[in-house]
Amino acid sequence: MSLILRFRSKDGMFRVNTDSSSTFQTVVDQLSLKLPTTDYDQITVSDKPNNKNDLGSQAKTLLSILHQTISELQLKNGDLLFLNYSNAIPQGTLASTSSTKLQSGSIAINSSGGSSGPATASGANASTIRVSPTTHGPVKVSQLPIDDELDSQDGILSRPISSMCRHGAKGMCEYCSPLPPWDENYRKEHAIKHISYHAYLKQQMAKFNKKELSSSYIAPLENPNYAINLNCNEGHQSYPRGICSKCQPLPITLQLQKFRMVDHLEYASHTILNDFINVWRSTGVQRFGYLYGRYEKFDKVPMGIKAVVEAIYEPPQHDELDGLTLLDWEDEPIVDAIAAKLGLQKVGIVFTDLTDSGNRDGTVLCKRHKDSYFLTNLEIIMAAKFQIKNPNITKYANLGEFSSKFVTCVISGGLQGEIEPRSYQVSSSAEGLVKADIITGSTQPSQIYVNGNNDTRYVPDIQYSKINEYGLEVKSNAKPTFPGEFLLVSLTDSFPIDPKPLFTSKISYVIENREFLGHGDIDGLDHLQNLSSVAKFIKLNDSELFDFHWLVHVAKMGILSEEELSLLCKYVKEKKYDDYLQLMESGGWMTFLTILEQST
């Protein structure tokens, strides 16, 4: 039977939902999210306030009753219990011992045996208390190096003495005092559209975890959850036969997201993008690729992050003039493994949407602009699914994940008919809407359709909020459709002035899955990856075997051992000739060269 227990402490009143057959451990797990301490050996529970009791029986610690059920403790719906503890108790997970020291002066909660004497923890051996990570600091996960680097910085923005200052060189006033990285005026003055992820994180940390409350911790990041709880235990039938305020999602108000997980997309060399676009130039069909690169610090935005693209891998696909279809990609684990050996990972996707203008001057049609759309509704949903598949790992969320650093880049026509890349992400709200199956595409590319209710989906009230021409906030109903721009976050993109790409072979290798380019052509073999193309690449480049597509092809051949493949990747990454000499002396490399000689 479901019931509610009430707890009163010096930090406030708490309500906990449970049932009579659950152990007190489930109650403590919920209390741990609200209490400023996790040392359960020092927290006493009583049915009288201030540890005062006429019967003279002893209070019990939370630790001593963890394994007893609610019915064994003779607790009823609505019972009020009092918690006593000290804020000076150190934080940390506590391992329980076989007995606990009890404080006197409070009446004990009745156990099944009715005894009010000293209690002991059940079990002869020590056990560890299950404590929510939010009670004692960030969770322990492996973040990206760039996140660890930015975590160690405060991001404070220094300002020089200005003409408004009326003090000496060692003074400070409101015109020259440092600013936090999320300062709104700084963002507007420097034309920064969104604050960075780590600036937003610092802002949330300052809001939820104040220094004077160092004994408590609240995870500052949380992904929105818009799905109904199909396993609600509030005593009603499961949805759709029953519903309550606890299991249904709250009303949703969509706003333009104020922060972005990645601020900038940089292609390490213009040839990376140029080679990708050449498919459209040759055939007129569209193309899709995965961006492999790394994340680095971006100095033009406070605490900013940029994704640096070193290679575009084109998976199996069926391309058409106005779209494409992705096919099964069986080699994805191999490609990811080679990228990891090189210090790279998937950072996003890229696809073309190009139509020749017909002017015979190399210009293309401009189809994406403020009066049409930037990403279509289906592309927004696709981007959200990719972001969900590639979450951002962070220690500042209870589940260790918050949104994503995965980028979506579309290559289309600019306002002057030029070919240009445009990079986007979708908001964390978009990810939540897609997870809950609330949105889908519509016949208008710029509009997103809101689904209706069904047996597994409950759609709450949804509104979107925008600022009108008078500077006032206006809310509109999002049903049945709403503009897709409310789910978009735009990035900047560029090429470096002084490019230093990782892959610098003199002659590029054949790019995968482009066999159709040579159809009906006497040079068709130039678009095939085979033993002949591998041997030709080695002959033309000598020792400069610095090409991602060639590395992946060699790995798929399965001739080199794991150690030899790692050595080859190390040589490509660090470009130390000693590693190349060591590779040449290995048995697998000699076998590899022998096979190439015999097959060509």
Swiss-Prot record:
Keywords of the record: Cytoplasm, Endoplasmic reticulum, Membrane, mRNA transport, Nucleus, Protein transport, Translocation, Transport
Biased composition (Low complexity): 109-128
Molecular function GO labels: K48-linked polyubiquitin modification-dependent protein binding; ubiquitin binding; ubiquitin protein ligase binding
One Pfam family of this chain: UN_NPL4
The MPN domain, residue ranges: 265-402
InterPro entries: MPN, Npl4, NPL4_C, Npl4_Ub-like_dom, NPL4_Zn-bd_put
Any single GO CC term annotated in Swiss-Prot or TrEMBL for this entry: Hrd1p ubiquitin ligase ERAD-L complex
UniProt subcellular location: Cytoplasm, Perinuclear region; Endoplasmic reticulum membrane; Nucleus membrane
Membrane topology category: Peripheral membrane protein
Domain of life from the UniProt record: Eukaryota
Region (Disordered): 109-140
Family indicated by similarity: Belongs to the NPL4 family.
Family matches, as PANTHER family: NUCLEAR PROTEIN LOCALIZATION 4 (PTHR12710), NUCLEAR PROTEIN LOCALIZATION PROTEIN 4 HOMOLOG (PTHR12710:SF0)
UniProt function note: Involved in the import of nuclear-targeted proteins into the nucleus and the export of poly(A) RNA out of the nucleus. Has a role in the endoplasmic reticulum-associated degradation (ERAD) pathway.
Protein name in UniProt: Nuclear protein localization protein 4
Taxon lineage: Eukaryota, Fungi, Dikarya, Ascomycota, Saccharomycotina
